[in-house]
């Protein structure tokens, strides 16, 4: 949310951010930090006397939202779960901070990218697993923003039907379910090809493609959705190339969808 608020002109209005608000890099220097998403310093927030606090239903705790509201602070709680939810959310945020024009411009760009994808020929499908954690290994269900984004590229989530949004799963489970592509994003777990490439090749086998990608582009909604939709375009091409070598990305292999 912070990165998007800055993108639509809200930097000068920011009086505080969590320690996990790291984007846009270089533009948050001097903004007070008010703790983490799960353990914010409510007293510190009140000392900053904000007119409005932005929160996310999944990332922030209900008790902290209620504490702020009880103290008379207005709290905007959002939770975009689908790519189509993002543009309306941006327009709403723009209206809340008096930046309607900039917000509408950004939302319109996202709408245009999304419309172009819908109007393009339907992509072929590929079965995938998107790993968000290691030890224990965890993945995502279809009830997530990233799964909705990858669906636009033709992705079929082999763990999509799970009741939990972020189910635990063993590496062998994905092979049994027919995953042809494994995604290893840079966040929330910091997967890196140079550090984890050999390990995942041993765990997941050499046949499935292994993509180390920028998690910010695929998991973060808001202004980052633009990069996510561009990644979808690249992934449509990548996933459709049958002649590429199997295994992790590298010289001679197709470009990874992001990063």
PLM segments and residue spans:
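N-terminal ligand-binding lobe of clamshell/alpha-beta domains
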Residues: 1-259
